[in-house]
Amino acid sequence: MSNLKDIKRKIKSVQNTQKTTKAMKLVSTAKLKKAEEAARHSRVYALKINEVLSEIAYKINQFKIVGKDDKFFDLKASINKVDIIFVTADKGLCGGFNISTIKTIRNMIEEYKSKKIKVRLRAVGKKGIEFFNFQGVEILESYKGISSAPTYDKAKGVIASAISDFVAGATDKVILVHNGYKNMISQEIRINTIVPVETPSIENVEHSSSLMEIEPENDEKILEELMKKYFEYSMYYALIDSLAAEHSARMQAMDNATNNAKARVKELQLAYNKARQESITTELIEIISGVESMK
């Protein structure tokens, strides 16, 4: 009987877990729809800013334009220090979502170290911060509570110090890494070099839908405002895109957990029925044996 009680207790425990994971899946599904829509709209705007900025970068390099912002487009400058801003979740239970980003960062660190290039980390998200702190890896700046509730103002705060360091010469390159939303069931690592801005090929510029002519006297002012928006929105989009990917990963993880719990309940139910049958058989044998002994 004690065995039957143990199995019954396990069944109830797994069923409770199943209810929890199912509820978490439903919550993640609802949040995903909202985050997915925000990421889709943000991506259109981010891509357009990148397109226009790349054209300006191309013209600066083509016509050898020199100004206070030309440092942002100098791809020939030597790279001795690299700042990597990476985004992970503040929470777990989302499968390999955080691990994928962490593995990418570790590989990048090793690659740059092999080239004698110093790497500085700026971490957004509790899970990434905890991992690298545990590993004893120095983190220049840490931000918690942002990846789970991103806003444009928060994004500005994260990217501002990295760009200031780049302008001051404290770093030679700023890279943004996050696990982005691909579709409902998959995510992909996205690595974006924020500065220096990469220059497109002549063919890409000539076929660009945003090709424009800018008056020389307005170049500096337009470029300054555009650069500011580019930095801020690149960071904001990474946060929004990462959040959508996090929800899709958690939805999938909770769906798998629910299915596993369902299968486990079925196994335990079979074990319970078998144990109960054996218990009844044993009791019948004991009764029959008792009757026989009385004859």
Swiss-Prot record:
GO terms for cellular component: plasma membrane; proton-transporting ATP synthase complex. NCBIfam families: ATPsyn_F1gamma (TIGR01146). Keywords: ATP synthesis, Cell inner membrane, Cell membrane, CF(1), Hydrogen ion transport, Ion transport, Membrane, Transport. The gene is atpG. One of its GO terms (molecular function) is ATP binding. Belongs to the ATPase gamma chain family. HAMAP family: ATP_synth_gamma_bact (MF_00815). It is found in: Cell inner membrane. This is ATP synthase gamma chain. It is a peripheral membrane protein. F-type ATPases have 2 components, CF(1) - the catalytic core - and CF(0) - the membrane proton channel. CF(1) has five subunits: alpha(3), beta(3), gamma(1), delta(1), epsilon(1). CF(0) has three main subunits: a, b and c. Transmembrane segments: none annotated. Produces ATP from ADP in the presence of a proton gradient across the membrane. The gamma chain is believed to be important in regulating ATPase activity and the flow of protons through the CF(0) complex. Its main location: membrane. GO terms for biological process: proton motive force-driven plasma membrane ATP synthesis.
